[in-house]
Amino acid sequence: MGKVIGIDLGTTNSCVAVMEGGEPVVIANAEGSRTTPSMVAFTENGERLVGQQAKRQAVTNPENTLFAIKRLIGRKFDSDAVRRDIQISPFEIVKADNGDAWVDVRDKKYSPPEISAMILQKMKQTAEDYLGEKVTDAVITVPAYFNDSQRQATKDAGKISGLNVLRIINEPTAASLAYGLDKKSEEKIAVFDLGGGTFDISILELGDGVFEVKSTNGDTFLGGEDFDQHIMDYVADEFKKEQGIDLRNDKMALQRLKEACEKAKCELSTSMETDINLPFITADQSGPKHLNLRLTRSKLESICSSLLAKLVEPCRMALKDAGLSASDVDEVLLVGGMTRMPAVQAKVQEIFGKTPNKGVNPDEVVAIGAAIQGGVLKGEVKDVLLLDVTPLSLGIETLGSIMTKLIEKNTTIPCKKSQIFSTAADNQPAVSVHVLQGEREMAGDNKTIGRFELVGIPPAPRGVPQVEVTFDIDANGILHVSAKDLGTGKEQSIRITASSGLSDEEIDKMVKDAEAHSSEDKKKREIIEARNQADGLAYSTEKSLKEHGDKIDEETRNNIQTALDALKAAMEGDDPEDIRQKSEALATASHKLAEAVYKQTQEGAEAASEAGEQSAGDEGVVDAEFEEVDEQNK
């Protein structure tokens, strides 16, 4: 078994870590940064950019630059959350055949797991460049409050990217692993995780290598992106009041505004006020317009007050479900970039009545925890037991459209529960099992995560046949459901892939596409490297030909020029092998020129040496004036 990497697949940024010599190490990407923007862009010439490269060109290519795709993963197009995103997204969100939310870029539709896979491939490449070996195994983190569909979609993304996902682990749980690995004393901690797109709160008990999650709660549509949006709306409204132009109608201006608002938000974590300056943001008949606005920390807090208020209830529910009061919590751990905001820290202090612990890096701690979990699975990290929970209740629809829960929320996983049901009508030949996830009493108010039928039930009065329904949640928090007719022994089972998730055929196709794209990327890299080397050779040959061409015969000179022209023509093409061959041909043809240059250099050195010896031989000779004396005149 090779190295197991830990990946924090974030809404705004992603991070990768690995265990090295018993210690987790965060790996910097090719640009030298320890986190990578979770962005994918498609350029006009068909190139795909991921990470920092995608972010750099977002302003000039807003419609084809995808960000915060994690907010769409495992979601229906018709859901309220997606509807809200459609209003503000510069790229096009469309309805897939299965009802999911997909994106349409340059006339091609992509599923969120496919886009996430591109980000995962970038993280995989980062790890491989650092380790110098191929990586196939990974532990990937998800928000604790992700439902079954979202977890399955994340696992699909891993598969599409060419990774073998050993475990899906909750982000707060990963953070607790990073925090408590070396702690021996027993303590109760709250992990407050507010990232770019999601909010989680988990209550855990740590002690002697056991990490037990007592409860979890959260909001999968609350994070830094929402704070940015509130600031953008405020700034756009102020600009409209002043200039009469709504920047929200201009996608390019909106992308510039988004970046400026995000920067201002970050700056206000350390300073009391900042300026948002965007020259030439737009124009009308009177000429160009500039945006210049001063934003104070107190104004930012009032703009985002409704979002800050949303942080309270999940914390209260998590404490209640864990059977604890705020005073029972020993430490509150801050995770996610948004927890750097002073107002968020003040809200945490208000909820828990204590100063939060800022001892971990909020951007890296989740990836570090994932790497530690990878070490646990590989056997590198000993004496660690992780007991996670399922965030939402699971059950089936029964007579009267009621949801009958088989597994309650905050049940430790893996777990298995069975219950016996019967038919609702006489001589009923089949039972439809409608699998639900959520906390509401009525089936229609909860999320459908799968349906299947158990057929072939022998005719009998209602209430007589006995059908055993079994729910089995694995360590990834992914559900497997089976139904068995105890009378005939007939069984029907499904692994819940979400009622609208990707089919195995679709995943296989996406895996092939990703592999093809990977080989395309490799070929592009080969071409670029071959061109770069050829360009260097062509430049030095041309320079030498200009300076020393007169020292070789005309035939040799013509041969070199022909080989040079052939190489330049090859560099225009896309065949790296052809470029390499033409480079070798030019190198061979240039041998005589190189000899002439070498000979001249040697002759020059010899001449300089002789001149040096001559001057050295004259050393000790003193020039003196002299006067002839006429002896006779004495």
From Swiss-Prot:
Biased amino acid composition, Acidic residues: 620-634
Modified residues (Phosphothreonine): 198
A Pfam cross-reference name: HSP70
Keyword annotations: ATP-binding, Chaperone, Nucleotide-binding, Phosphoprotein, Stress response
Induction behaviour: By stress conditions e.g. heat shock.
InterPro entries linked to this entry: ATPase_NBD, Chaperone_DnaK, Heat_shock_70_CS, HSP70_C_sf, HSP70_peptide-bd_sf, Hsp_70_fam
HAMAP family tied to this protein: DnaK
The protein, known as: Chaperone protein DnaK
Organism: Syntrophotalea carbinolica (strain DSM 2380 / NBRC 103641 / GraBd1)
Chain's gene name: dnaK
